[in-house]
């Protein structure tokens, strides 16, 4: 038996392990175990237990406490409507167990790419290998009443998996989210066999795992190009597989407003790109629930006061410098226009917007992002009741607007997130967790460069990292701007502002702790990669996001990586990529050439 122990940093010992992100501690052998197609999952927490065998009425053997609706629909449903009550967290765990079993049993991932060509690597179907007949899950969690759908993702994510040579499986966790994380790892231990059932070649297995950071996110722009709910759900599936837990949906911008706001029907009706491309209230809730079922909290960003020109399609009187011919004087990108700062009508609009939106999203998330970036001063030269681009004049009006909106968020128990400019450029005195308590402060997201992270931390704010020089996924594809005839503003080679492309290796070795004093590191809540969508739509978004966001996911889960980790990471990340391409329909870009993955000779230099 080969026994390999992996404490944090993996070495290459002949066999490449299957797991992404890398667990905190991982040891394994080289014995094969089959997984029975009728394997039982026995789940126990402090309140109840159930046994799951197969998706049929006869296959669910309930110990007291089960729900009749699951007997009628044992697979559960991702689609929810506003009228339905929210599921409880125990149902999230049950659904995760069902998905895990279904995914393993129905996997199409045969890992031939990871063995020398024509090598017979699959176990013989000779009855000599033990079979896993039961997976026992013990969850030492709080009572279910203490977990709500929106906060359970903040629970203890630590878990352990023990698999013996004889096929005994024990999974232990301390919370529902810990159980879900364990199942996401458990699924990656198995492969499809060309002529038989699923198997793992790694027994015995011992895994102890927990994350480095609690906020592990992807920022997805759903406004500049049409990104539909089904595209976001597909993205959530990939996120969950690498233990990313926050989907930051940049939900509106100057180009379009795709969200239906029932109390302001004109907004999406006039500001969306097309009536068929509006996100209904039920679709938004369904996406949020779909994420929570998989351990991903979906929260919205409505950027204020910049990036709001789309509001002018419905309410032009609320927007200053709306659709100016020389847009570049009034905006970072076209079209120009920002909501007015000194307008009672704007405040009425914001109050109505928040009164509609926040009660709908807050039961399913604890965050709401109010933006605050790329705020153009010249715009307010054209606001009749203001007429100034002087920062000293504008600051009190900006401060008043942000404070007003944030007060409505806090009254609903929602934590505001803002972009870095509000505290670095405008020096607004927003409450931090030190001045307003753990839930009363804002979280600040740094984006322009890595030095901004340190500057935000020095002001005492909890901070999200993932800046343009490290984790921007849209960089390097070229500018969307066309040159005007005779203009030299846009020239060959027509680069975008953050070129070159941040490839997966670059994203993998980004160290968010570099140059951050130890005494400030506790303020780092985590990070996000960013998929801005000027040149992204559902056709190319998968390959633009993946596998690069997965590379960042390991940094967020396991901690900073180094160039010495890249060789091993290329094999593990490529295995993850093959798995989601084959089994989840994710059209992820390549990690490595097949020749290199087969390791017939070195692809190192």
From Swiss-Prot:
Keyword Kinase attached: no
Alphabetized InterPro entries for the sequence: Beta_hexosaminidase_sua/sub (IPR025705), Glyco_hydro_20_cat (IPR015883), Glycoside_hydrolase_SF (IPR017853), Hex-like_dom2 (IPR029018), HEX_eukaryotic_N (IPR029019)
Localization in the cell: Secreted
Residues at the catalytic site: 293, 374
Record organism: Arthroderma benhamiae (strain ATCC MYA-4681 / CBS 112371)
Disulphide bridges, residue numbers: none
A GO molecular-function annotation: beta-N-acetylglucosaminidase activity
Predominant location: secreted
UniProt-recorded name of the protein: Beta-hexosaminidase ARB_07893
Keywords (A to Z) from UniProt: Glycoprotein, Glycosidase, Hydrolase, Secreted, Signal
One cellular component (GO) term of this entry: extracellular region
Enzyme Commission number: 3.2.1.52
Positions of glycan attachment: 30, 342, 449
Family the entry assigns: Belongs to the glycosyl hydrolase 20 family.
Signal peptide annotation: 1-18
UniProt superkingdom: Eukaryota
One of the GO BP terms on file: carbohydrate metabolic process
Reactions catalysed, as given in the entry: Hydrolysis of terminal non-reducing N-acetyl-D-hexosamine residues in N-acetyl-beta-D-hexosaminides
